[in-house]
Amino acid sequence: MKQYLITGGTGMVGSQLVNEIKKSDSHITILTRHDQISNDKKISYVNWAKSGWEHKVPQNIDVVINLAGATLNKRWTPEYKQTLMLSRIQSTQALYELFKSRNKAPKVLFNASATGYYPPDLFMSYTEVYKTLPFDFLSDIVYQWERFAQQFEQLGTRVVIGRFGMILSNEGGALQTMKLPYKYYIGGRLGSGQQWYSWIHINDLIQAILFLINNESASGPFNLTAPIPERQNLFGYTLARAMHKPHETWAPSLAMRLILGQMSTVVLDTQKVLPNKIQALGFQFKYSNLKMALEDLIKE
């Protein structure tokens, strides 16, 4: 039986991932910030906000999946920016210190990251061979998060970094936010509309994570995005058609930056990111184009 330790296991990605892992011969320990009782014999919860939590984590952990981190979908005040950074760095460091103190390290660590690692560009296509240093706040979060995760290599653990694109799901996240203006007939172009949206269907993301965990030749960073990214204007048009709504309005970049503040970078300063590395290992996307993904997710 394979032993999993998961942070962020009750979030949008984590909860679906847990449901998928449960189908195999496994036991899952989920680290949470509050007391929780499990009614499932395959799942146990450990409140790692409490002193002594380390002693409640099983000794024979095979796989660590680190998804913990505060949501980006809030206004980035100076205080919240600190929360965004520390929620990722401190949790990753705590995991490292846990296994450093033990004689047995996990075989593999899957650590979440984001395509915000790459600089915004309207014309460049980014693959995993591209290396960079932090250039803004979001890229600094990603860079530091990956750096802390890579410490696990010192323990002999295989480290896999998953740079998530925009996750499309019915359970929350970007898609639910993007649907709102179309619901009220005010959806349309954002800024120039030429910025890239490198997206991924939640089901493909879950399968990609498990594929990388189970593939012993997988290590280092992987772009977890669909093979065909779209520019925002076409993305919005495709979403509007799926919802049977118009795509006619325009929100200027300046207005969005004034309203959203630094958080506007998530929708305006984006990248074209391609999943070359995972495809080279043989992974096949079920939802490779946006129309197919939205038809599955939106039943209007």
From Swiss-Prot:
Q: Which domain of life is it from?
A: Bacteria
| One Pfam family per UniProt | DUF1731
The UniProt entry, under InterPro entries, shows: DUF1731, Epimerase_deHydtase, NAD(P)-bd_dom_sf, SDR39U1
Q: Which family does it belong to?
A: Belongs to the NAD(P)-dependent epimerase/dehydratase family. SDR39U1 subfamily.
Q: What is the name of this protein? A: Epimerase family protein SAS0734
> Whose protein is this, by species?
Staphylococcus aureus (strain MSSA476)
